[in-house]
Amino acid sequence: MSKIPSVNIKELLDAGVHFGHKTSRWNPKMGSYIYGERDDVHIIDLRQSAVLMSVALNAIYETVKKDGKILFVSTKIQASDIIAEYAEKCGQYYVNHRWLGGMLTNWKTIAGSIEKLNKLEKTLGNEEALMGYTKKEILDMSRKKDKLLLSLAGIRNLNSKPDLLVVIDTNKEHIAINEAVKLNVPIVAVVDTNSNPDNVDYPIPGNDDSIRSIRLYCSLFADAALQGLAESMKASGVDMGAIQEHTDKALTSKSVSKLKQTKKFSKMKNIDEETNTEFEQALNDADKNKNSENA
């Protein structure tokens, strides 16, 4: 059984995962993941979010367990630093500024840019070599290095296509998703109410704008990857005492077939009554708190 992070509805609710976009901005393909609307804002069905997050976390865990590589992608401002932080935490790869066209499909060009970055760093770190350059030339090299680092820092050690792509905001990262589809790289993605989930293998219905939500997603992703790494190292005979334990609860992953994902929640048999009750209670508690604050 995989020891990946547990997901509970209250945690998702507290992070604002249930808040979608204004009802006028929705994508009809997300209809089966929407619980309802309040104040002209769609409310995401966290019962499905919890189950599908479990499925996605298991995919991350299994990928790393089998020594696969994961590429985290989100170039939006509020996610940029968070993506880098958690990707580095679990020893994986990331793109958190601009996605350069061809990062996956034209790797030869990207590899050339990485080689250029390495040469610039080597030159700038050699005081003797810098003696032959003017101050302006050194400044130009430094600027080129910084520009390349913004785009390539998180993938400079990636020497082949990733085994799994993890995306926050499918609309903004549509180029990355299209490239992954062309190369048959499976995709985990947070899909908001204005998203198109069609090309996503492991969709997670949720708010893709809130910093609290994004941090929660990335924390869960990183912990699942670390658990996969621990299993991989254990299988290789590595001393497990060197690996920090990040979770103390085992999660039983609940599977949802792609056919059932297109149906309304009420028809999905994989979500139990306990999850139903938890979601309804969490929403009621949130309403009570809101009403008491406005009283």
From Swiss-Prot:
Domain of life, per lineage: Bacteria
Similarity section: Belongs to the universal ribosomal protein uS2 family.
A GO CC term attached to the entry: cytosolic small ribosomal subunit
Name of one Pfam family that matches: Ribosomal_S2
A biological process term (GO) from this entry: translation
Gene Ontology MF, one: structural constituent of ribosome
SUPFAM superfamilies: Ribosomal protein S2
NCBIfam families: rpsB_bact (TIGR01011)
Keyword presence, Ribonucleoprotein: yes
Keyword field: Ribonucleoprotein, Ribosomal protein
Gene3D superfamilies linked to this entry: Glucose-6-phosphate isomerase like protein, domain 1, Helix hairpin bin
Protein name: Small ribosomal subunit protein uS2
UniProt key word DNA damage: no
